[in-house]
């Protein structure tokens, strides 16, 4: 089963993902935890370019193709092999991030981005996408505090430096995209405590795994 986590900056994706991974492992599931950008060796180099606060001059089109390169490598080297081994794959961001950030955020055509991503991932879309939702201002405050605390503001602060208007477009884009793909999307209130968010996520995934065991879902969808 392939599960992705999406949301604006500071929505708590990494915390929720780690909580779910621990629960899955406790219940006997093999788990592969990964992220975008940076899930492969090549991806780590691309991540350093894409998130560096000094690279504010990257054009939307250049940004798009850097993300697509990261994703194509990630799917080929990490995601597909883990799925082939029967593992539950958890990814902190995936193709929907590009559709939303570069589409709704930057103004590129979301449907064109959907097609480009389909090529990059070879038709592999998640079985389940968990969208952690909160107001952009609250998320940015969390993300900025985290980056400063971890000494990563310069190395990974490029998106946090975007305007509140940009992050508002991204948040609205996520909700629009989730509504268009409701079959695989579940929206979780990210203003809750981390423990409550993990509880909600575990409940969603436990139900989805029940569908898998009954043959109603597969490991990786063809089409979004």
From Swiss-Prot:
Belongs to the thymidylate kinase family. It catalyses: dTMP + ATP = dTDP + ADP. It holds the Pfam family Thymidylate_kin. The keyword Translocase does not apply. The keyword Lyase does not apply. ATP binds at residues 7-14. HAMAP family: Thymidylate_kinase. GO terms for molecular function: ATP binding; dTMP kinase activity. This is Thymidylate kinase.
């Amino acid at each position: 089963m392939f599960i992705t986590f999406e949301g604006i900056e500071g929505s708590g994706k990494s915390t929720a993902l780690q909580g779910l991974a621990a629960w899955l492992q406790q219940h006997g599931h093999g788990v592969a935890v990964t992220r975008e950008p940076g899930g492969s060796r090549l991806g780590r180099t691309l991540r350093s370019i894409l998130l560096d606060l000094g690279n504010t001059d990257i054009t939307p089109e250049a940004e798009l193709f850097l993300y697509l390169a990261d994703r194509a490598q990630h799917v080929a080297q990490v995601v597909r092999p883990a799925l082939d081994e029967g593992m539950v794959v958890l990814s902190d961001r995936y193709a929907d991030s590009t559709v939303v950030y570069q589409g709704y955020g930057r103004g590129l055509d979301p449907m064109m981005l959907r097609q480009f991503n389909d090529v990059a991932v070879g038709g592999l879309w998640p079985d389940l996408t968990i969208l952690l939702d909160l107001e952009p201002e609250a998320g940015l405050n969390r993300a900025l505090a985290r980056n400063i605390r971890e000494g990563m503001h310069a190395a990974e602060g490029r998106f946090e430096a975007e305007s509140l208007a940009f992050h508002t477009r991204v948040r609205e884009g996520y909700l629009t995209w989730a509504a268009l793909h409701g079959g695989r999307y579940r929206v979780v209130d990210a203003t809750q405590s981390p423990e409550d968010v993990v509880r909600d996520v575990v409940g969603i995934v436990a139900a989805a795994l029940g569908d898998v065991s009954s043959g109603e879902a597969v490991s990786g969808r063809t089409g979004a």
